Amino acid sequence: AGPDGDFYHGDRYIGIDKAITALPQVRPVRGDLRIDGELFLFAGITGRRFWPQSNLSLRVRRDGQTLQDDFSHEQCLVVSQDGHRVLVSGCAHNGILNILDRYRDLFGGDPDVVISGFHMMKKQPYDCEKLDVIDETARELARHNTVFYTGHCTGLPAFERMQTILGEQLRPLHSGVELDLATR
């Protein structure tokens, strides 16, 4: 097991390949880590505003027990360069608003750019409650002077709905796209 346990979606293992964790150059990181003057890695996201309900099917096996994954291991990277800060996240299992709250606790303001999934993709149509969460998340993001690039696990219906609120503040991200972050 890894330092935080083994991760599963149902019965399917979705954690890091054990061959990778065995490599001598791989260093497990817990908590926050300043890598250098430009790179800062953080975890410790504890907020639960609009915590994605799709997380409920994700589990961790730790000390012989299978538990709901709390995503305390989820890490985000902040790249600081030329007076700008870019926040990079993966699927945002903790919820993008909670990740931004933690970022603001650490840095005292908003990032210039966020590159992240929003973990809103669904196989079934959204019900009214989920649509309200998408809208409220977009309204909250619109209050910040940040450009958001998302794709991946956000899902096209959620992206399109959020873009009606965020406009050019929300931009699509696809494999192979090159971002010129200097021009935002």
Task: Kindly give the residue locations of the regions a language model identified.
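Metallo-beta-lactamase
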Residues: 1-75, 167-184
